[in-house]
Amino acid sequence: MSDFGNPLKKFKLVFLGEQSVGKTSLITRFMYDSFDNTYQATIGIDFLSKTMYLEDRTVRLQLWDTAGQERFRSLIPSYIRDSTVAVVVYDITNSNSFHQTSKWIDDVRTERGSDVIIMLVGNKTDLSDKRQVTTDEGERKAKELNVMFIETSAKAGYNVKQLFRRIAGALPGIIKDDPVEPPNVVTMDPIRQRQIVTDEGSCWC
């Protein structure tokens, strides 16, 4: 039986990874089904929210987009601390960003222990001719670290919906069916909130 009348369950997803791996682009593709070719580094932390309709309930996903630059690293543990899901993103054309995912995952487990869902995401599959990290390498690391794994392209939209479907299926108390969207229901319910502004006059991205 559907419990659409019950209060929304809220789950916090924090996106982590090196600068320019595509964290913001993945969120933008999921929220708005769009892609911005103009790169602008995230300043501080951005927060967005979207309602997702599952087989047996409705949930609100709170998406926290973190900056990859070193100068913002000290801010990130406080955002990891109460998260349900950590999405650790790397760029398949940048082997260093892949190697750094081990550190990001360590940071998550330092703050959350084992009480967290971790998804390792290899982004930018549209640039396969420049690939430096194979799919097998990503799968092996995910298995070694006991985390989930998927490859995506925020630019092409490849596997982005599947990424969030798999996350939704792994959420605590959620039956692991693919989420469905009831007909004639608008699911995009974005709330954007600037959490931290460190550079005066900077624009969000």
UniProtKB/Swiss-Prot annotation:
Any one GO molecular-function label of the UniProt entry: GTP binding
Matching Gene3D superfamilies: P-loop containing nucleotide triphosphate hydrolases (3.40.50.300)
Pfam families in the record: Ras
Keyword Transport: yes
InterPro entries listed in its UniProt record: P-loop_NTPase (IPR027417), Rab (IPR050227), Small_GTP-bd (IPR005225), Small_GTPase (IPR001806)
Effect of Q69L: Constitutively active (GTP-locked form). Reduces spontaneous reversal rate and mechanosensitivity. Punctate localization in the dendrites and cell body cytosol of neurons as in wild-type. Promotes the punctate localization of lin-10
Disruption phenotype: Grinder formation defects, whereby the grinder is formed, but it is small. Animals have a fragile cuticle phenotype, which is prone to rupturing at random positions along the body. This phenotype is intensified in response to hypotonic shock. Due to a compromised cuticle barrier, which increases permeability to exogenous chemicals, all animals become paralyzed in response to acetylcholine agonist tetramisole or the GABA agonist piperazine.
Location of this chain's protein in the cell: Perikaryon; Cell projection, Dendrite; Golgi apparatus; Cytoplasmic vesicle
Family annotation (SUPFAM superfamilies): P-loop containing nucleoside triphosphate hydrolases
Cellular component aspect of the GO annotation: cytoplasmic vesicle; cytosol; dendrite; endomembrane system; Golgi apparatus; Golgi cisterna; Golgi trans cisterna; perikaryon
Lipidation (S-geranylgeranyl cysteine): C203, C205
Tissue and organ distribution: Highly expressed in body wall muscles, pharyngeal and vulval muscles, hypodermis, intestine, the gonad, coelomocytes, and neurons, including command interneuron (at protein level). Highly expressed in the terminal bulb muscles.
Positions carrying Cysteine methyl ester: C205
Source species, domain of life: Eukaryota
Keywords recorded for this protein, A-Z: Cell projection, Cytoplasmic vesicle, Golgi apparatus, GTP-binding, Lipoprotein, Methylation, Nucleotide-binding, Prenylation, Protein transport, Transport
Binding of GTP, residues: 18-25, 42, 66-70, 124-127
GO biological process: adult locomotory behavior; cuticle development; early endosome to Golgi transport; intra-Golgi vesicle-mediated transport; intracellular protein transport; mechanosensory behavior; positive regulation of feeding behavior; protein localization
Protein's job: The small GTPases Rab are key regulators of intracellular membrane trafficking, from the formation of transport vesicles to their fusion with membranes. Rabs cycle between an inactive GDP-bound form and an active GTP-bound form that is able to recruit to membranes different set of downstream effectors directly responsible for vesicle formation, movement, tethering and fusion. In its active GTP-bound form, acts redundantly with rab-6.1 (in its active GTP-bound form) to positively regulate the retrograde trafficking of cargo molecules from endosomes to the Golgi compartment.
Subunit structure: Interacts with GARP complex component vps-52. Interacts (in GTP-bound form) with lin-10. May interact (in GTP-bound form) with eat-17.
Family listed: Belongs to the small GTPase superfamily. Rab family.
Protein name: Ras-related protein rab-6.2
Species in which this protein is naturally found: Caenorhabditis elegans
Upper lineage: Eukaryota, Metazoa, Ecdysozoa, Nematoda, Chromadorea
Gene label: rab-6.2
